Design a protein with these regions (language model features):
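Alpha-helical transmembrane segments of multi-pass membrane transport proteins
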Residues: 1-281
Length: 281
């Protein structure tokens, strides 16, 4: 009960800690990208590009999962988007049920570790709260033992910021993506019936290259702006989240067209619902 009250107070009363401001921004970014069908275009394009390779469709799912994780930071939107799109395609092309579902679940949860992860933001906030409490206790103990009010900084306790957490998780996330791809490729080579190659009836010409670039450039640009600004120290996590939210809104704006305002309402309802649920939990 005491820990719960402490967490509640740190969330709603400790106004000088603004780490959690980034959460609704990244949630907004993720849901807007999901509703604008970016995931569908990425999966279709990657499947056409890597389909002829053994296990190519599974590799495409992992790559798209990594791209969505790096642009959304939330797991639910990624798993739902890829499950609805890629699972029927994988089963229709005679993929193993276990490999298909395992690939989708594993690649969908990459959002837990690949920045900008909501989990890492919450973890950084909790570590900061714990470090503040431990620092206060250590200063009180130092004052009681030595009688001095100023404790040397070398004895103080510091915590990792959300940006530090992102920098620490970026390379392990890429390693995890590489391991997933190697596992699917190895399985497809050893047991071809579990992940057969899928032929592409079209031609790999300039038009196809333009199609691939048009599908990849928007999310890659958003990743570069958001993660690049954080990892290089140009912007804080909150500032990068705001830039990412604006970028996602622009990307969704030119896709949710035809002057049908009703297409926007499911996105806004989902955004407010997930944000409210996240802060309540």
């Amino acid at each position: 009960l005491s820990a719960g009250v402490t967490n509640f107070r740190s969330l709603y009363w400790n106004v000088e800690r603004d780490t959690l401001i980034a959460i609704p921004l990244f949630i907004f970014m993720g849901i807007m990208l999901q509703r604008s069908k970016v995931a569908e275009d990425l999966l279709v394009t990657m499947a056409q590009l890597f389909g002829p390779i053994p296990g190519g469709l599974g590799i495409s799912v992992v790559l798209v999962g990594a791209l969505l994780a790096a642009t959304t930071g939330i797991v639910g939107a990624t798993v739902i988007a890829m499950g609805m799109i890629s699972l029927p395609a994988m089963l229709r092309n005679k993929y193993s049920h276990s490999l298909a579902t395992g690939t989708i679940c594993a690649s969908g949860t990459l959002g837990q570790i690949i920045p900008p992860s909501i989990v890492l933001i919450i973890l950084a906030d909790q570590l900061s709260s714990a470090a503040d409490q431990a620092s206060a206790m250590r200063k009180a103990a130092y004052r009681e033992i030595t009688g001095e009010f100023s404790m040397p900084s070398v004895l103080d306790i510091s915590s990792a910021s959300a940006g530090d957490m992102f920098m620490g998780a970026f390379v392990p996330g890429l390693v995890l993506v590489a391991l997933y791809i190697l596992y699917i490729l190895f399985t497809a080579i050893i047991r071809p019936k579990m992940a057969p190659p899928i032929g592409y009836s079209g031609a790999y010409d300039r038009q196809f290259l333009v199609k691939v670039l048009m599908a990849l450039l928007p999310p890659l640009s958003l990743i570069f702006v958001v993660l690049g600004s954080i990892l290089t120290g140009v912007a804080t996590v909150n500032q990068a989240g705001a830039v990412g939210a604006v970028g996602a809104m622009l990307m969704a704006g030119y896709r949710l067209h035809h002057r049908d305002e009703r297409r926007y309402w499911p996105a806004f309802i989902a955004i407010f619902s997930v944000i409210a649920l996240g802060f309540i939990v």
